Each structure stands twice: as structure tokens, then as C-alpha cells.
Amino acid sequence: MFDIHNKPNSDGIVKGVSGNYEQFSQIINELVDNSISNYRAHEDEAGFLPVIDITVTEYDKTVEVFVKDNGTGLRNLDADLTLAGAGCAETVLNEHGFGLKTALSSVDSWTIYTCTKEDVKLGQHKKIFGPYSFEKFKGWLCEGECPDCFCPGTTVRFTCSKAMFQTLKPANRRAKDGFWALIKYLREELGYTYAKVLADREVAISVKGISGDSEDEKEVEPVMPRWEKRIKLPTVKTDLGGGVVEVDCEYGTIIPCRKNAKYYKANLTSSGVEIRVNGRVIECGLYSRIWNEAPHPSQNRFLAQVCITTDKASALPVTHSSKNGFRKGDEKLEALYSWIRKNIQKPEKNNQSLEHRLVACLAAKMEQQPGVLRVSMEEGAYTSIGSKSRIDLFVSAEEKAVIYEAKAHTTRAENLYQLMLYWDGCSMDGKPVDEAVLIAERHPSEVFMLLDQLNSQKDPTGRPYHFRVTTWTEEGVSLPATCA
């Protein structure tokens, strides 16, 4: 027999654990989770609205963040700061025992200030500095009230790089965003993650940004979908394999939310099934794993919200320690997917694009107009040279011929150049038009600027261009397309 010396290296473990959090929002969510968990576990002690105040201050190369709550304070620091110390877990929000330590390992520097009711009576508070360590890890007992935290309560202060802070921006934005835009994204992220918690007034969260002499503080509002059609199921009790849980579910078709940067945009990444546990989102954008097929673009406005309520962690599908998804292969997760398949109607595919349906509605209206002689969708252009180009809509009336280039939502300046090509193609084919219309839900300022410039020019035959922009609403076509 011989000894194996395998004492863990604390620096190596901390570096390994820190890689689990790649997003600034994961760090913030972990700290907010801990505060909410504390409130829920001790709600009988609170005679006030639980509050979480988040302050983000911009510096040259870093941001400094304070996450401050008015909970009970950390009563068992040994357990709270033990990696995998789930024995101190107060609710299912901190079941793993990794979250706080992972969050602290993912930032540049950190400090915890905490004060319990007992500390208040003794006129003291506690302070713990990073870096995290398994040996000779010490805290400081300080006299007086803590200026940086509620008493009782807990504050976590940390700094991180601006590169980490930039991870708040939506994935489709490649350029760096400014500080105030990132603050707005942070509010949206929190409002989405804790939407049902905030809507039920279980807690109030505020985010304050500070940059130089400028400050802006706002309470986080719940980010909720706007339903066009919705089916709400009654609350049901079911056993996923670890005990009975309550399931609330609603699903249907949502209206795209233009004011949001990321959520409920009715696109591929913000549609599908959204699963929450006790009001906190765990995973979203689920479709192919449930129905075993890729979603079709026509299903982008489909949303299903499934909220599981339980105080028993063992009754739930197993989550990642970062709580940003469920672990694949878990039997309780498969049972949940089966419940969803049985109780939620999978959205039907529509192989026609939204643009095609809108143009079809417009064409139907044009056919009813007096003096209209011919209405054609997918009209050929440059046919005289064998081109297969197609114009969205061609309308010939007694007085003039008009062509349409259609976009469902927003146009771009280059769409006008496409329309110009179609105008020239019609002239080449011997069927010159009198007006070319760009139609969409909305048009940015760049389109109007280019419109004026192009309308001052002439086509190759010497005829002046006549371009016009309009909206679906102005033409009496509703979004989403309904041809009633």
C-alpha cells in the first residue's frame, strides 16, 4: 500500500471553475439567485419588500459592480464559501453549491460585505476579500455599520473587464456597444430572467449606471411577451420522476417586440419553448430537442412558456451548475419533454414566407381597385435577356403601371437600388412602369435620404424615376398577414 498525494491546487480549481461563466449576465444572475433564495427561505422574517440594488460604475478599463440586498445576511460563511457546499442551500435556486464561488472566480477582484441581525446588535459587520483560496482563507470582523450594505443584508462588490461587460450585447451585434446601451441590455436580461418573480412583486430589482458625472437608476420591469393568440392551460400537478410538481403553461403566437434588444423578437433565437423553475428562466429557444425536427422560419412567432413550481430540487430535471440549461440525458427532463409534446400543440409550418403572404394580401386588395387591368405576383424582369429575376408585385391600371418591392419589417437603402433595377428591366422588356414602390412595416432615415436622390435622376431611356415608400398599414394590410 502507498499514499497518493492528490491535494487539489486551489489556483487551478478556481481557474477551471471560472470557465463555466462566459457571460456577464451569468455572474449577475448568480448573485441575484442567492438573494432571492435567501428571501424565499426566510420570508417569515421579512416585513418589507425584498430589494436588490445593482450599481455599475464605468472606469477606463474596467467596470465596478455592487449587488446589494436587504436579506438576512450570510449566517454560515464557512458553508457559503465552500466549493460544492450545497449543505447551506436554502432553496432550489442554490442547490449545487457552486454558483457563488463560480461567479467570484469569474471576475477580476471581489469583496463580500455581510451583516446579520446578530451583527447589528453587536455593532459589527463582516468583510471577505478575494482571491478565493482553500487554505488560510480569512474574513474580517469590522466595527460599526457597513457603509456599503443594508444592515442586515449582503453586498457583493466585484470588478471585471470591459470585454466581459460587453458580453451583454446581443449576439448579432458585432461592434462594441457604449456603456449606457449595455446598462439597458442588463435591465432587459434581468427583466427576462426573473419576469414572473418581478411580475408577482416577490422582489424589486433596480439597476443604476454611473459613468463620469452621469447617473441613471431604474427599477427593472418584467419582460413579458405580447400575445396575438394564446392558449392558457390550467395548473396541473404531475410527477416527472422525483415527486409531484406544479406546471403552468401557456402557448401561442406572439407579436414581435421591437423595443427589446434580444427577447420576444419572434426570430429563431427568441421563439420555441421557454422553461422556468419557480419563475426563473432556466432554458429557452427549445424546439428541435422536443419535436425532433428543426424549426421552420414560419414558426418564429411560436412561443410556449412552461413554469414548474416546487420547493423540492430532487423533483426537477437536473440543471447545469450555472443554471443556464438542463443536463441532457436526464430521465426527468425526458419526462418533461414528453409532457410538453402531449399537452402543447406543435405549430404548423407555412412554407410561404411572411413577405409572400403580405404581398398576396396586397395583390388581393389591388384586384378590387377600379381601373386595375392586371395584377401579377412574381412578375418577370429582364425577360428579354433571359433573366429569371422576379418583381414582387406588378399592377397595371388604366392610368399607370406600378411595381412593388416588399419587405416584411424593415427596409434598407440597397432595397431602393433593387427597385431601380426592376424599373430598368421593365423598360428593357418594353413594358415601362410609371411608379416603383418600396413597401414594409417601417423605413429608416437612410431610405428617405436615398429616395430623394434617386427621384432626381433619369432611367436609361431618359424618363425620370418615380420612387415611393409606403407601409403595410398605409395600404390596409395588417401585420401579421391576414387576408380577411
Language-model regions: role of each:
Residues I36-T91, Y132-S133:
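Conserved beta-strand-loop-beta-strand hairpin that lines the nucleotide-binding pocket
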Residues T461-A484:
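Non-catalytic C-terminal interaction segments of nucleic acid-processing enzymes
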Residues S288, P370-E399, T410-T411, G476-L479:
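Active-site metal-binding core of divalent-cation-utilizing nuclease and nuclease-like domains
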Residues I112-G123, K407-A408, D424-P460, T471-E474:
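Nucleic-acid nuclease catalytic cores
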Residues E90-G209:
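GHKL-type ATPase core
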Residues M1-V51, L77-A79, P317-K323, D330-S338:
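Bergerat-fold GHKL ATPase/HATPase_c domain
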Residues R75-D78, C284-L286, T410-M420, E446-M449:
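Active-site-adjacent loop/helix micro-motif of nuclease/hydrolase catalytic cores
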Residues K232-Q369, L373-S376:
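Charged regulatory segments coupled to nucleotide-binding catalytic modules in large multidomain enzymes
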